[in-house]
Each structure stands twice: as structure tokens, then as C-alpha cells.
Amino acid sequence: MKPFTQHTGLVCPLDRVNVDTDQIIPKQFLKSIKRTGFGPNLFDEWRYLDAGQPGQDNSKRPINSDFVLNFPRYRGASVLLARDNFGCGSSREHAAWALDEYGFRTVIAPSFADIFFNNSFKNGLLPLVLNKVEVDALFAQCQVTEGYTLTVDLAAQQVITLDGTTYAFQIDTFRKHCLLNGLDDIGLTLQHAEAIRAFEATHRIRQPWLFAPLR
């Protein structure tokens, strides 16, 4: 997992509440057994005017020019600004995969659905909570300033805007540690590889009957 320390990026404002996981990555794209290939179909039903299917050539599909992610000014955005209850709906880790693969490093919103919130941390995507007044201020600045960027400093737990305004945010200490060091569940386990090997070696000696062949 790629570490998240400090990120400066273009902001894209998605001004909709209750964005659910089926809108983030529609169900027909969940057939893949891989965790890659979802970025091109992020917000598929909003980005395109037709119904998308897995393996389809998106370059030939009609674009919804009214959807914010298709605006030229937000091309290459890596910070998604959202509204309340982002990531609600059914549980699918694919939603975090799609956002990450598209290029978003963080989603800023007043609140997140619990399962999406947890899945994001496990995949290196920072779900960053600011209060509604602060999010409203960011929306206002983003919509009037083309090329609006901001910086997220995870170590300092601050969002830093173009004019130097800073917004503090809270994050669980363990989750912060994992993001700063790029540690997913496997990475955390591998940190204890020597202890695991030592346990397995002595465990086999202490309880050999557990390893005897079945008869």
C-alpha cells in the first residue's frame, strides 16, 4: 500500500449528499475477481449517458458533459470534496478501489458511511472528516477558483488551503500510523514475521499431535 504523508492536489467538488457505493462503482462491474480495473468506471452512471458493461471501450461511449468529473477544469483531480454520508449503501470494497485507481488520494466530507470509511483506510485512501461549515467554505472556494488545490498534511493533521487557512482534523492513532507507513493488513502481519516463525517452530514441538498425518 502506498504511504500517505502529505498530499497536494486539485480538488473536485461533488455536491451531492448520500452518494452510495452503487453510484461510486455500479454492481455490474463487481464480477471481476481482481482488485484493479475499476477506476475507468468510477461514477459510471453519472459520467456516461449509456449503460456501461465490464470490458467495454469507454472511449467510444457518450460522455455526460454535465457531470462535474467530466469538466475540463477538474481533469486530474486527486482530492474529492463531498457531502454528508458519502459511501453509504451496500458493502463493497470495490468503491475504495475505484476511487484510488482513478487517482483520488483523499475524500473530504462532513460524514462517511462506516463500512466505506473502514475500507478506505485499508486501501490507502484517506476519508477526511471536516465539519459542515468548513466543507461549505471549501466548496465555495473550489467553485469560484479554477485550478483550486489544497494540501493535506497527515502528520500534522491539517488541511491547508490556497490562502493559507488551515483546518485541523481528527484521525485514529493506529490508522494514522498505517497510512503514514503504507501498511495494509498484510503489511501489518509481515511486521511480525519473525515472531510468527518462532511461534510456529516451538508450537510444532510442544503440540506435535496437531501436525500428525490423519489416519
UniProtKB/Swiss-Prot annotation:
Top-tier EC class: lyase
Gene Ontology MF terms: 3-isopropylmalate dehydratase activity
One GO BP annotation of this record: L-leucine biosynthetic process
Keyword Amino-acid biosynthesis: yes
Membrane-spanning parts: none
The protein's annotated pathway: Amino-acid biosynthesis; L-leucine biosynthesis; L-leucine from 3-methyl-2-oxobutanoate: step 2/4
Top-rank taxon: Bacteria
Subunit and interaction comment: Heterodimer of LeuC and LeuD.
HAMAP family named in the record: LeuD_type1
Role of this protein: Catalyzes the isomerization between 2-isopropylmalate and 3-isopropylmalate, via the formation of 2-isopropylmaleate.
Entry similarity comment: Belongs to the LeuD family. LeuD type 1 subfamily.
Name of the protein in its database record: 3-isopropylmalate dehydratase small subunit
Source species of the chain: Xylella fastidiosa (strain Temecula1 / ATCC 700964)
Taxon lineage: Bacteria, Pseudomonadati, Pseudomonadota, Gammaproteobacteria, Lysobacterales
